[in-house]
Amino acid sequence: MTSWADIVIQGLPEVDVHLLAVTGSTAVELHKQLPPHVRSIQTVPLFGAAEPTEFTRYDEPFATTVLRRARTTRGAVERHFVPLLTRLLEALERPEAAGRQEAELIRDLNRYFVRFDHRASFRSEAAWNAFRDTVLAQEAGSDVETTLGDLVQGLRWLYSFLLPITMPVPKTDVVHATLAGFAGLAGVISKLEHGTPFVVTDHGIYLRERYIAMSAAGDSFFLKRFLLRLVHLVSRVCYVTADQVSPVCNHNARWEQRMGVTPDRIRTIYNGIDTDVFVPPESEPAGRRPTVVTAARVFPLKDIETLIRACDVTRRRVPDVHFVVYGANWVDKPYTERCEALIDDLGVRGHFTFAGYHDNPSTLYHEGDVFALSSISEGFPFSVIEAMACGRPVVATDVGGVKEALVGGIGIVVPPRGHEPLGEGLADLLLDHDRRADLARRGRQRAVEQFGVGQMLDAHRTTYRHWAGLPADPLPPAMAPADDPAPAEAVSVAPPTLPDAAPRDGLGEGPSRRPRPVYPPVVSDRSARTEHALNRGRGPPPAGDAQGR
């Protein structure tokens, strides 16, 4: 996701950008050079801030902060916040039905937090009593055990995950969210407050990935259900409010339609790469062991354990095979330790290497004969099309848009978690030079013709110009209806009227310069503690792609 945001921002210098970066904690590292047309960047740490306003409103006059806290009296909380909190808890009982009223609830919460103190409101006795009484009443008569610890953690989650809506949302021409999740709520608020067009790009399906993460979490049933309902509600509100939802592959559209997006608002925009940078090597090194290369952050969604088991399968036919995984192996230390233990258990220590972060992704793929992807969830993985552009045959699991990239037999697609077919497919290619060469040639050709960065940037440029009311080429084609969609009625708001002085020949020139699209997020959090919480359902979705780039 970070690679995508960097490409789009760097590639559209005519668009002024204001960034809203939702991060896991305060321990963040800015690892991308921001161009001059990025006018501002606002970080919102969900965890770790003793006083969140130090980050969310760092430029606010101290007197304003003091006055907001002073007006957050017990009476104000009881009159204004408790009814909103109760409405939210009631909405969580049926997140699949979220629509206009729930979008307005998000806006009303934002209006409240702009005027009153978020921290004082959640820490109040009135809020705790309302939360406890409402939840226990909802659970009355059910078989679900709800402990005091569950209630405390549930309220803490609400405190943290609602931080992105605690500050004023500036008026822009377009709001662009990188997922239908908590970061996207800025788009919901801006549309209802200002009539701002709202665009969502779906790399993966946020709710689906939370289901996967929570299934392995050690939390109670109550907490798992509570968080999944919250994510479901937030995702659906984003979907039904968005003017355009652009998945990075058609595969995601099925989920989007089931989550309330009408087909006429779904316009797929594939990821794109610079095929002049990602190129085949000039020559192959002599004497290299048969090598399988992977670019992946080491955490559960990438299912590195299946890749390790596939290595054990492949070495039966290719005894000197070497698997090399490039990518951050510190983001989930317990998972990395499990992988290391599995390597030892299977006796593949001499065949499997975690090589860490690679500082030159365009040459990473040259270090293998074949590229492998073992993920259990993806959007449209950059790593697959980068490998294709570098002339590396691909063996990948059937997740996300992988089949759309490898259409026509350009690679080998195997079932997720299927270490036997994955290992056999890799062995087949390593032992068949002619087939590797054919797939390399056809993969490179498809990457150049279909997945160049120019096509992606043109589609996003058109999207921005269209929704900003500027002359534009036709939008990407809308999605054909699914066989069994269950769309909700979209939230309808009249488009904003642009000033007459607004430039008509570009988005960044002219006498009347206005703030431009908001892209949440572009800053990734490399904190191991936060990443571990993330994969247990306690944090935001992964901020980067395969390597966290």
Feature locations, PLM:
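Nucleotide-activated donor-binding/catalytic signature segment of Leloir-type glycosyltransferases, i.e.
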Residues: 336-357
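A short, well-ordered alpha-helix in the C-terminal region of glycosyltransferases
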Residues: 428, 435-466, 476
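Short hydrophobic beta-strand element within catalytic cores of glycosyltransferases
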Residues: 393-396, 406
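Carbohydrate-associated surface elements
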Residues: 251, 272
